[in-house]
């Protein structure tokens, strides 16, 4: 239990941030899983169309400082490499 009103407020704020962070992380994981499923099914066009959505989400999380920039860049690059592997051409 917080001892002061400001400590109570800080606790409420941190709980709201925690919920947002969990939702964002869950959404990211779900979208990456969807893309990986498309790649495994070798659906090239759908995977290429879906990739910008994940890219946008990663960039938003970096902008809000919920994800480290290098981590997001690494995720984007690895997903793009998997897409390139099924399409057979360099997208970069």
Curated annotation (Swiss-Prot):
GO CC annotation, single: ribonucleoprotein complex
InterPro entries per the UniProt record, alphabetical: Ribosomal_bS20, Ribosomal_bS20_sf
SUPFAM superfamilies given in the database record: Ribosomal protein S20
Pfam families: Ribosomal_S20p
Gene Ontology terms, MF aspect: rRNA binding; structural constituent of ribosome
GO BP annotations, alphabetical order: translation
Keywords associated with the record: Ribonucleoprotein, Ribosomal protein, RNA-binding, rRNA-binding
HAMAP family: Ribosomal_bS20
Function field: Binds directly to 16S ribosomal RNA.
Similarity-based family: Belongs to the bacterial ribosomal protein bS20 family.
Protein name, entry field: Small ribosomal subunit protein bS20
